[in-house]
A protein has these predicted regions:
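Duplex nucleic acid-engaging cores and interfaces of nucleic-acid transaction enzymes
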Residues: 66-67, 71-74, 100, 108
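Conserved phosphate-binding loops in nucleotide/dinucleotide-binding enzymes
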Residues: 60-65
Length: 204
């Protein structure tokens, strides 16, 4: 809960804020916890928010309810020790103890080693186009708890509320939830491994 509080953020579709959540949880959390433990919990759809990008485009965020943020954060804290050791040393984004400054220093080290050609790559609309089947297959290789896998799958398919209309989410993982960055790294680790296999130097 402390991490969810620290990240603050806007309310989800239920309108419950971080400040309102303790009172809300006293009423609703016991039943929600029992639903999670018995594999019956259904995440609520995320609320669509559009953020302007410097290039004039828009970044689409999906804001979960505070309850779903709390559950996602708990899942991320359980899965990070499992998956993070598998990640490449050249991966810096959304990882504990790693940051963009370290990525820059690694690139500077490549330059000192004589590498002179650099390619800057942007994975356009990555979060919006995540393949659910591929991601769930990767998760299933390391997670034996079928209830947890099913819950993650429900988060991926929870849908997006746009102007009062529920849109299905058959693809993608919404930017805005605590779990999405870890899921992105799990999927992108396949790219990192292939780049390493080919002998490329990179920082992601």
């Amino acid at each position: 809960m402390e991490r969810v509080k620290a990240n603050k953020g806007a309310p989800g579709i239920d309108g419950v804020t971080i400040e309102d959540f303790p009172a809300h949880a006293r009423v609703h959390w016991p039943a929600q916890r029992a639903q999670i433990e018995h594999g019956r919990y259904r995440p609520q759809p995320v609320r669509r928010v559009e953020i302007p990008k410097p290039d004039g485009g828009k970044r689409l965020l999906g804001i979960p309810t505070v309850t779903d943020r709390l559950v996602q954060q708990a899942i991320a804290q359980v899965l990070t020790p499992i998956f993070d050791p598998m990640f490449s040393d050249s991966s810096f984004g959304f990882r504990p103890g790693r940051n963009a400054h370290q990525a820059i220093r690694q690139v500077q080290a490549y330059v000192k080693d004589g590498w002179r050609i650099a390619v800057d790559i942007d994975l356009a609309k990555f979060f919006d186009t995540v393949n659910h089947d591929l991601l769930m297959n990767l998760l299933g290789r390391a997670i034996a708890d079928h209830r947890l896998l099913a819950l993650i799958g429900r988060y991926l398919r929870a849908g997006v509320l746009v102007g009062g209309h529920l849109e299905p989410s058959d693809i993608g993982t919404p930017q805005g939830g605590p779990l999405s960055p870890l899921l992105a790294n799990i999927l992108l680790n396949q790219l990192d491994c292939e780049l390493q296999r080919r002998g490329h130097r990179f920082a992601r």
